[in-house]
Amino acid sequence: MHPFQWCNGCFCGLGLVSTNKSCSMPPISFQDLPLNIYMVIFGTGIFVFMLSLIFCCYFISKLRNQAQSERYGYKEVVLKGDAKKLQLYGQTCAVCLEDFKGKDELGVLPCQHAFHRKCLVKWLEVRCVCPMCNKPIASPSEATQNIGILLDELV
């Protein structure tokens, strides 16, 4: 490839020889673009697609978790901020018998007993009572009201 090819064969591109001939770039159409430009455009499109796919999966999983908590009537907390108000540090999950650790996702029932969220969902699929006190869990309409009351109490 000649170094002058991009400048229509004249020396203006390198500034080596002064010439009276006017030098201008030829118009470039989309079909004349080099292959690497197509690769950049294609790669950017794939990147944006993958990023949007990741966001969609994240929001779908969040919606699924929210639907489970509304279905079974428990409030979801992360053992970080809300756990201090509920005094959950050092306690044990009654379902799996493991201690609560930092950033664990917990489910808090209307009776104020807390469990790991996954443990609680499995328990509530089998029995609709609290694993600690055997208090029945309210129906979904009552559970929504109870969750609102619990949220107001925690804030």
From Swiss-Prot:
SMART domains: RING (SM00184)
Cysteine pairs bridged by disulfides in the record: none
Alphabetical GO biological process terms: negative regulation of mitochondrial membrane potential; positive regulation of apoptotic process; proteasome-mediated ubiquitin-dependent protein catabolic process; protein autoubiquitination
Key word Hydrolase present: no
Zinc finger boundaries on the chain: RING-type: 93-134
Keyword Cell membrane: no
Tissue-specific expression: Widely expressed in several tissues and cell lines.
Cellular component annotations (GO), alphabetically ordered: cytoplasm; endoplasmic reticulum; Golgi apparatus; membrane
SUPFAM superfamilies according to UniProt: RING/U-box (SSF57850)
TM region positions: 40-60
Compartment list: Golgi apparatus; Endoplasmic reticulum; Membrane
Pfam families: zf-RING_2
GO MF annotations, alphabetized: ubiquitin protein ligase activity; zinc ion binding
Topology within the bilayer: Single-pass membrane protein
InterPro entries, A to Z: RING_finger_E3_ligase (IPR051834), Znf_RING (IPR001841), Znf_RING/FYVE/PHD (IPR013083)
Keyword set, alphabetical order: Endoplasmic reticulum, Golgi apparatus, Membrane, Metal-binding, Transmembrane, Transmembrane helix, Zinc, Zinc-finger
Location, primary (coarse class): Golgi
Function: May induce necrosis and apoptosis. May play a role in cell viability.
Protein name: RING finger protein 122
